[in-house]
Amino acid sequence: ELGLVGSEMCIRDSYEPSSFQIKAGETIKFEVENVGELVHEFNIANKMMHMKHQPEMEKMVENEILLADSIDKEKMKKMAKMDKAMGHSHSNSVLLEPNQKGEIIWKFDNAVNIEVACNVPGHYQVGMIAKVDIN
């Protein structure tokens, strides 16, 4: 038994809810639904990790894997054979097309300065971030 705490998230052009209160050591199951019209990401990381991940996302756009409202999954599979990052198979992240659902189970151990963010190019920059308060 994982001892999960469930959290439902809706993504449009922001996260709902826009912040979380989490106890240190708690395991959360995030059920995420993209109810918007664009591709969005739900990524749990600190700011430095988000900054490091953003060029990978830009490369997915440049290679026409990541489109405004869809993901070319066939192209993603092919590119992932050459560059693992292009497969976007990160345990802390889910990349969702419009009307798509996904989930992440995450244990918040020794986490500092964690935020949930969308690293689709331009989205983080316009404030697509949810605050995570760990106590």
Each predicted region: which residue ranges?
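Single conserved hydrophobic/aromatic residue that forms the stacking wall/gate
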Residues: E1-I11
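Beta-strand signatures of extracellular beta-sandwich domains
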Residues: E41-A45
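Structural beta-strand segments of beta-rich domains
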Residues: E26-F30
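Extracellular/periplasmic metallocenter environments
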Residues: E37-L38, K73, K77-A80, M86-N135
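Short edge-strand/loop segments of extracellular domains
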Residues: N46-H53, D133-N135
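Asparagine-centered strand-capping/turn motif at beta-strand->loop junctions
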Residues: V32-G36
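Aromatic- and Gly/Pro-rich amphipathic surface segment
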Residues: Q54-G87
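Short beta-strand segments of immunoglobulin-like
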Residues: S14-I22
